């Protein structure tokens, strides 16, 4: 059975944070967050680690799409 993968927006919504709050927790600008959420930029390994740590979502359940 395939595990459900959550993207950065789904995780933010589950955490009940605004984009500004999520960007702050990730240590990135809101513009950078928006580019990640819209698939315009590829997530860096450091951002993935931070997202995992603040959300508790296992790495393998975080959807990290390639840059379009």
Where are the predicted features?
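A short, Lys/Arg-rich alpha-helix, primarily the initiator
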Residues: 1-14
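Residues within the helices of the helix-turn-helix
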Residues: 9, 20, 49
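Alpha-helical residues within the helix-turn-helix
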Residues: 13, 24, 53
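Short alpha-helical DNA-recognition segment
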Residues: 16-35
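DNA major-groove recognition helix of helix-turn-helix/homeodomain DNA-binding modules
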Residues: 46-61
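Short amphipathic recognition helices of helix-turn-helix/homeodomain-type DNA-binding modules
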Residues: 61-68
């Amino acid at each position: 059975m395939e595990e459900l993968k959550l993207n950065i927006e789904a995780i933010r919504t589950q955490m009940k944070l605004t984009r500004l709050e999520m960007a702050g927790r990730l240590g990135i600008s809101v513009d950078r967050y928006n580019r990640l959420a819209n698939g315009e930029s590829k997530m860096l390994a450091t951002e993935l680690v931070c997202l995992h740590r603040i959300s508790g979502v296992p790495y393998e359940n975080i959807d990290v799409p390639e840059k379009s």
